[in-house]
């Protein structure tokens, strides 16, 4: 039995289903518990699976869970849950909530690595406390301001106005909505409203932030644009610039620590974070520790998008079902402020329900938009509806089903058409404009249909067309790059994209990056952290970015990384035109597959 379990775990490692690191953790804890034996054999299995679960995006491993079991491990290998629980708690290295132990097993039989359990507990506690707090406001003054900021456009509740009213009443506000639903437009008006309603002698200290430099730049741009349409006399003392969360918190190079923490909190009254679906558990825990208890927090995001690359689906857990579940008391307050409000929930609402709102009306994609229709169809999970949209003949949507050699020939044409302007740009500014107009997105990194294969193909195509000069295959003018590792001293972060271009002042080739304020900043190539070519990037890396035109390439075979959320995120990166290259069966499999990440956060946030 002992040899069987270990040999099966070894085989799972060899097949790439679990990491060698996962098995080593299991073996280490088995040794700490006293070595081999039936009980410790069950510990070896549990610890290895808990660690492997984290590498697959889960926060914990439910003991009853066998659907996501590596194929090399037969379900019969899993002990009966109640017996397994007893043996784990008797091992000496597994504790319960409140204990300090390498592994934590909660009452629902969810097994956590200690640090992730601590993060989940902290996040749940901090958010529940903020959601429970009540803000006082003058309803007469507030209603007049809300009417100025959100003039009536029709019958029924204006959810953007309702979100602003919620911001007055609740120190924590979670706004979810698809692309073009006006999240940042609403946020700009919320900032104006809160600043106008503030009774202090000094204006509110407000910060804008996002997980990546690109997302921060987009937030900056959106808030500036929204300010232009504010009513006269409003919009004073608005923040000038968004920044990355790492910069806001003061990341310390070479560590996972931040300058701002519970002992040295941020000096803020209000923090607005965009693209919150990209925030992982560790970063959110650090943020909540550094945010003063009295400060307001507004999170903007799209619950249907991909979750963070790291463990958890934090923003989706915050949003719950997405449907309004407001209390009678809150609805009465909203009615007083706006004159209208949806009906209160018939079911008892959880602690976070009164702090969440879903914006539904899209303004970017009109009724005749194929991109918007396809995103909605994918989100519904209906393969039939997806196919109906794809073959309706929308002008902003193109579908290509070619495979094999035909696919490569077609891709060569698309690469030349899409990147000609960037590769042939006369100036750095023109090159950046062209780079931000078109992007090729892949679902995977490896293989001929992954970013590695497509970037190699793109460089070959452009070189043969005479658009890349010189023999150097890495350092050449016009090469787009993406940063893969944070470099805090250079203010470069994982996912930042740049362009290699000669500096007009010294004619030296440098890597240029767009800062959140719009400036182009040069970096000497020898100082760059880990990076790669970025004609094509993964959908994960493109999250938080938008492009006028996107070519979305799915692999020719089914892959476990394909999911409805991945597809939806890729589709909604396109603003004006989407070209989808996908095998029919692979596309259908992606639409049917829903990402499920195990954690206890949603239960802790939404259970009464």
Which functions belong to the PLM regions below?
Residues 1-144, 150:
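Accessory, non-ATPase domains that flank or precede helicase/AAA+ motor cores in DNA-metabolism machines
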Residues 66, 123, 212, 244, ...:
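Residue-level signature of catalytic and energy-coupling elements of molecular machines
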Residues 154-168, 427:
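Pre-Walker A adenine-sensing motif
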Residues 162-164, 168-389:
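ASCE P-loop NTPase helicase motor core
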Residues 174, 270-272, 298, 441, ...:
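Structural motif
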Residues 304-481, 487-490:
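Conserved helicase motor core of P-loop NTPases
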Residues 380, 496-608:
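C-terminal accessory regions
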């Amino acid at each position: 039995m002992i040899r069987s379990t270990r040999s099966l775990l070894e085989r799972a490692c060899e097949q790439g289903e679990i990491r060698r690191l996962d098995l080593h953790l299991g073996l280490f804890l088995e040794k700490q518990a006293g070595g081999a034996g039936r009980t410790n054999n069950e510990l070896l299995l549990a610890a290895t699976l808990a660690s492997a679960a984290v590498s697959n995006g889960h926060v914990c491993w439910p003991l009853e869970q066998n659907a996501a079991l590596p194929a090399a491990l037969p379900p019969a290998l899993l002990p009966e849950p109640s017996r397994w629980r007893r043996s784990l708690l008797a091992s000496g290295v597994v504790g319960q909530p409140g204990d300090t132990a390498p592994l934590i097993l909660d009452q629902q039989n969810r097994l956590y690595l200690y640090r992730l359990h601590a993060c989940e507990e902290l996040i749940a506690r901090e958010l529940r406390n903020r959601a429970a707090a009540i803000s006082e406001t003058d309803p007469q003054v507030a209603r007049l301001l809300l009417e100025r900021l959100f003039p009536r456009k029709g019958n029924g509740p204006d959810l953007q106005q309702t979100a602003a009213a919620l911001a007055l009443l609740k120190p924590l506000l979670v706004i979810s909505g698809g692309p073009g639903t006006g999240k940042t437009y609403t946020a700009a008006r919320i900032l104006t409203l809160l600043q106008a309603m503030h009774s202090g002698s000094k204006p509110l200290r407000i910060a804008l932030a996002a997980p990546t430099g690109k997302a921060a730049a987009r937030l900056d741009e959106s808030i500036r644009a929204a300010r232009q349409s504010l009513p006269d006399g409003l919009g004073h003392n608005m923040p000038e610039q968004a920044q990355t969360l790492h910069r806001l918190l003061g990341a310390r190079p070479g560590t996972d620590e931040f300058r701002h923490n519970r002992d040295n909190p941020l000096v803020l009254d209000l923090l607005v974070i965009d693209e919150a679906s990209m925030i992982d558990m560790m970063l959110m825990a650090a943020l909540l520790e550094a945010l003063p208890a009295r400060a307001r927090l507004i999170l903007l995001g799209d619950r249907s998008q991909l979750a963070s690359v790291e463990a958890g689906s934090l923003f989706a857990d915050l949003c719950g079902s997405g449907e309004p579940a407001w209390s009678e008391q809150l609805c009465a307050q909203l009615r007083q402020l706006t004159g209208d409000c949806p009906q209160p929930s018939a079911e008892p609402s959880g602690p976070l329900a009164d702090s969440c709102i879903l914006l539904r009306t899209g303004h970017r994609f009109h009724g005749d938009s194929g991109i918007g229709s396809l995103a909605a169809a994918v989100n519904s999970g209906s393969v039939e509806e997806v196919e109906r949209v794809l073959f309706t003949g929308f002008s902003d949507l193109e579908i290509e089903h070619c495979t094999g050699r035909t696919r490569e020939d077609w891709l060569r044409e698309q690469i030349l058409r899409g990147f000609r302007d960037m590769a042939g740009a006369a100036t750095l500014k023109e090159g950046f404009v062209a780079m931000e107009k078109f992007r090729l997105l892949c679902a995977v990194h490896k293989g001929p249909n992954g970013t590695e294969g497509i970037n190699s193909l793109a460089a070959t195509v452009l070189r043969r067309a005479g658009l890349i000069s010189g023999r150097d295959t890495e350092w050449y003018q016009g090469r787009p790059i993406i940063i893969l590792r944070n470099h805090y001293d250079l203010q470069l972060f994982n996912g930042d994209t740049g362009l290699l271009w000669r500096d007009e002042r010294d004619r030296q080739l440098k890597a240029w990056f767009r800062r959140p304020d719009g400036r182009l900043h040069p970096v000497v190539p020898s100082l760059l952290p880990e990076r790669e070519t970025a004609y094509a990037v993964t959908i994960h890396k493109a999250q938080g970015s938008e492009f006028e035109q996107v070519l979305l390439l799915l692999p020719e075979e089914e892959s476990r990384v394909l999911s409805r959320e991945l597809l939806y995120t890729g589709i909604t990166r396109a603003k004006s035109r989407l070209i989808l290259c996908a095998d029919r069966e692979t596309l259908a499999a992606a639409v049917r597959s829903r990402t499920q990440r195990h954690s206890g956060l949603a239960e802790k946030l939404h259970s009464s």
